[in-house]
Structure formats: C-alpha cells, structure tokens
Amino acid sequence: VSNQNPEQIARDAIDAQLRDAGWVVQNKDSINFHDGQGQAVREYPTDTGPADYMLFVDAKPVGVAEAKRETLGHNITTVEEQTAEYATARPKWIQSNGKPLPFLYETTGVLTRFTDLRDPKPRSREVFSFHRPQTLREWLAGCRSLRDRLRDLPPLDPQGLRQCQVEAITQLEASLRSAKPRALIQMATGSGKTFTAITSI
C-alpha cells in the first residue's frame, strides 16, 4: 500500500466507503446491473469523458461521484462544476432521458460533499457517508427533497406562545423556506428559548 500514489489511496478509501453504504463497486469493463441494490461503476464513459464513479440504481444512472486526492480536502468544492458536467453528460451504452442526474458527490475518501439537484436551490453540503442505493431509490420514487418540503411548512399555531416565541419561530421558518444554510435565534434570558426550540421542531 505504501507504493500507491495519493489518487490510488483516495480511490481505495472511496471504494470502501461505497461498499459500506451498500454499493457494489465495479469496473466499466465488467458491469453487472443484477449484482446488488446499486452499482458504482468506475470510470464510466460519457460524452464529456469518464466519470470517476457513475451510480446506478435499477440499471439506471442516478448520480455521479467525483474522486479527488485527500490533499484537495478543504478545496473540494472547486470540483463541483466538473461533477455537474458529468451529471448533464450523456452516458454511453444506455438510454438517457436527457435530464441531469440528481445526486452528485465530491469526495476525497475522507471528506464527502453531496448535492441534491432536486432541491429548489441546489448546493453542496458535507455528509458523513454516501447514501445507500435504497435511499436514492426511495427519493426518486416521488419523495420530495427535505429542502423542497421545508418550503411547505404548515402554519404555526401561536396558541400558548409568547409574542417573542412566535416571532422567533416564524423567522426560523422563513429562513428554512429560503433554503438558508444557517439560522440563529437570539432571545433574552427567561423568554422561553427551550420551549421555542422544541416547538420549532
């Protein structure tokens, strides 16, 4: 293992993470869509070049994973554009519906970022691991993305809440609807922060 270059070391780690998440890692020369719930095919050819990993569920491409060496780490977001190109590329040997693949990953084998193109305002976020093939299948079966569902939160019932709590929860919900990545609730001591936090969940 010590004679491997950084790219090979990263690929070994990525292969292991994909397997841990339930993907069957395969080479492009020996694809078997009947092996396992989902297949991660290395160097799958597209009309813009080979994708590091093309993810298949039910013999259909559903996503891509762009692999980079670990030293890229904190700068991994710089390859998001490359991943997006593969998502819109036409895969070889299979019929394509012309739509971009919805699930995009960039990974070093240590750090993994994920973008769900079904989101109203797609943007990448760090995830602990690859999603399981079954999870992607469920999402594709009609389940809206979390960020999309957050746009349709039910109205708040203000009964039993103080005005400052109503304002805090209303502003938090507005932030969630806008797909903002962070929100801060600042309330005075004794104003019911704990109750507000529980109510907002």
Tell where the protein language model's regions lie, with residue ranges.
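ATP-dependent helicase/translocase motor core
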Residues: V1-I201
